[in-house]
């Protein structure tokens, strides 16, 4: 498996992976809500690549995009030491070390870039993700009550952080 920076050529596979992830109910988008096309996604990848406060990595296995992690660093003096993470892994590749490999790359990049705090959110009932994040050293910081509406019902999110 190769972990590398995303390229514009990844746009189509990235959109397909996101559609699959949206169907899980654990991501921000509802199934079918994501309206991005390949050209718009290519531009978004190019913008992230050009943004020094962003870092976008993908995991590729046999020329197939199987996971990603987006790192969105604070843009101001007071929060540039902190970065928010978004992770997604193809359901067929979970439990095979894809997420761990992506996290390890982010930890290395963060230390080089002077990022000392990583944070993420996870839907409270997404126990596999919560357990993975805990295994990777993330600590529960708090609970965001009724932060999302899923199938018409309020759902809480956990805030988690890791200090480097």
Which residue stretches match the model-derived regions?
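Conserved GNAT acetyl-CoA-binding A-motif
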Residues: 103, 110-121
């Amino acid at each position: 498996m190769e972990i590398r920076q995303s390229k514009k050529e990844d746009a189509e596979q990235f959109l397909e992976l996101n559609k699959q992830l949206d169907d899980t109910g654990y991501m921000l988008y509802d199934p079918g809500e994501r309206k991005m096309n390949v050209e718009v996604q290519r531009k978004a990848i190019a913008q992230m690549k050009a943004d020094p406060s962003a870092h976008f990595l993908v995991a590729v296995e046999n020329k197939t995009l199987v996971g990603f992690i987006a790192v969105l660093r604070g843009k101001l003096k007071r929060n540039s030491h902190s970065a928010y993470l978004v992770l997604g892994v193809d359901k067929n590749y979970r439990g095979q070390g894809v997420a761990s490999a992506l996290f390890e790359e982010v930890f290395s990049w963060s230390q080089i870039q002077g990022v000392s705090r990583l944070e993420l959110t996870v839907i409270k009932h997404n126990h596999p993700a919560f357990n993975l994040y805990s295994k990777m050293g993330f600590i529960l910081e708090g609970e965001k009550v009724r932060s999302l509406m899923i199938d018409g019902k309020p759902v809480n999110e956990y805030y988690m952080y890791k200090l480097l």
